[in-house]
């Protein structure tokens, strides 16, 4: 008859530890043409489940404001509120790359304020930071990267600029606006961003930008 393997795994057999996701390793994922998975988390249970599920990137987003704290937009959330969420998520994440959103006002006034916020984030467990804006943020991104902290950019529909945009509207629909967003993406890549969020833009433009960039 057919033999049955009754060999059991020894309790002393080491289990394979999933490889830690880093900003550079995500670059290799894109080069291979593989998909990158990402989720937002604001608390320990959500972070733990995302990490155990094999999610590559966990973002502590400023959407904490209007999805968990009851604010009408992302604008009112404070740095201290973001830190509470960041520390909780840090306790649940081991494998995934942990990225933290820089809230409105934490990088808009001057470079020192921005760098001080970044340093506090890293000391609290963030492995990368995300900030919104196009070419006008390129030099700040360059400074942060030069200080050893990976940066994720964010262009298109940028919620922190909701009032200037006239609401949550699709961006980049005209040829001129599409060209401007492509130029923004190229500048952010050149400045050292390891990834860019493309929010609220036509899928054809997103595809074009994705193909033009190496990140």
Each model region followed by its residue ranges:
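Alpha/beta enzyme core
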Residues: 1-215
């Amino acid at each position: 008859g057919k033999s049955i393997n009754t060999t059991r795994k020894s309790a002393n057999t080491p289990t394979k530890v999933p490889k830690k996701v880093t900003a550079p390793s995500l670059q290799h994922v894109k080069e291979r043409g593989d998909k990158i998975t990402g989720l937002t988390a604001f608390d320990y249970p959500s972070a733990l489940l995302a990490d155990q599920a094999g999610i590559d990137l966990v973002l502590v987003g400023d959407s904490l404001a209007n999805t968990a704290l009851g604010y009408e937009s992302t604008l009112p959330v404070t740095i201290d509120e973001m830190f509470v969420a960041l520390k909780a998520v840090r306790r649940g994440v081991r494998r995934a790359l942990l990225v933290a959103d820089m809230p409105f006002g934490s990088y808009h006034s001057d470079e020192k304020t921005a760098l001080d916020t970044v340093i506090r984030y890293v000391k609290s467990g963030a492995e990368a930071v995300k900030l919104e804006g196009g070419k006008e943020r390129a030099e700040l991104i360059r400074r942060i990267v030069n200080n050893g902290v990976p940066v994720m950019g964010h262009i298109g529909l940028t919620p922190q600029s909701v009032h200037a945009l006239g609401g949550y509207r699709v961006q980049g629909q005209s040829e001129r606006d599409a060209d401007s967003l492509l130029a923004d993406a190229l500048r952010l890549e050149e400045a050292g961003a390891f990834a860019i969020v493309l929010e609220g833009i036509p899928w054809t433009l997103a595809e074009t930008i994705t193909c033009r960039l190496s990140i």
